[in-house]
Amino acid sequence: MTNALASESLVVAEVRGRVGCITLNRPRALNALSLGMIRDITAALIAWRDDTHVLAVVVRGMGKEGPFGAFCAGGDIRFFHQAALIGNPELEDFFTEEYALNHLIHTYPKPYIALMDGIVMGGGMGISQGASLRIVTERSKLAMPETGIGLFPDVGGGYFLSRCPGRLGEYLGLTGHVLGGTEAINMGLADALMDSGRLTGLWETLGQTPFESGEAVERWCRNHEQKVFTRVVWPLAEVDRVFSLDSVGAIVSALAATPGDWAAQTLAVLNKRSPLMLHVVLEQVRRARGMGLADALRMERDMVRHCFQLRPGMASETVEGIRALAVDKDHSPRWNPARVDEVMPEMVAPFFVSPWPAHAHPLRSLS
């Protein structure tokens, strides 16, 4: 894939010098991923993986005002909603192929450099957390906000969140808290900080520099980073104390009993989330902590299948969450159950039962 795709393409993939360059080109939707975009990114990465001329890959997002300013806001949740309601089989394809792409990035044999400027959420984290170099800026906003739509942190979220220090994985997964660039570095979700004003020059120079190896590309990018001299002040001891508790009910009770703004604000956020999915996410992150990436992605593929299946007598929490946030926009989801203490273990357990035998799992080939 040595030629640029047409400028109206949602993914522009081109080789510039000896670097494979990917631009997510859907700025009006904050580069939200469609199935076609996932397929285009995958095709480019596979072609470049086997092309000895290409030494490294760099990915960016197009902003509304031009290059950069937004990386990727996640998956196309309006598509999820419509596809779930009409039974569109492309919904199954979307998650299978997205998670396979996430695995491809994590295991890519050449340096894969993500320029994570602006919004980096959900699916945007999925195409950046596996990068060998994750560059953030002063404009970066990173999050896994899926509990806000009755979903869970997928795209490998259980895997990479559970590897954050202490119990930050549980905290970030349950709340969907948004991190700035420096915070993300402190928490192990980014590697380097760069002034956003330098990104265009970096991008242009990548295609003009006679690199000799992929490692040289990565080193060259690192030469543009800023030093992070300060650590973000976080109540890490409180996070660990509260989010290491055994259950969502215990976490909520501990927050209610803890004085201070952090506990009050965190409790207010959790009270807006799907009680069922809070229980599911806590279990997900803790299971994933002991899993490799491939197994964690297979688990998430099982989970997302259950999320979009309409439960007998109950609506899908995910369909309802998307309706409230992005379709009707009433911001009043009707969660079922409505309270944390109404969620029973038998409601959570089915999310972790695969609907496929191992030999037929859609991600069986991941290793």
Q: What positions do the PLM features span?
A:
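A structural preference for short, pocket-lining loop segments at secondary-structure junctions
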Residues: 17, 22, 40-85, 104-115, ...
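Contiguous mid-protein beta-loop-alpha structural module that forms a pocket-lining wall or clamp
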Residues: 156-159, 163-214
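Amphipathic alpha-helical blocks and their helix-capping loop/short-beta junctions
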Residues: 195-277
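An acidic, glycine-rich surface segment that forms the CoA-thioester-binding/catalytic face
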Residues: 77-116, 157, 348-357, 363-364
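C-terminal amphipathic alpha-helical interaction region
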Residues: 311-313, 317-367
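Gly/Pro- and small hydrophobic-enriched strand-loop and loop-to-helix capping segments
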Residues: 131-154, 188-203
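Glycine-rich beta-to-alpha active-site loop
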Residues: 105-149, 172-177, 181
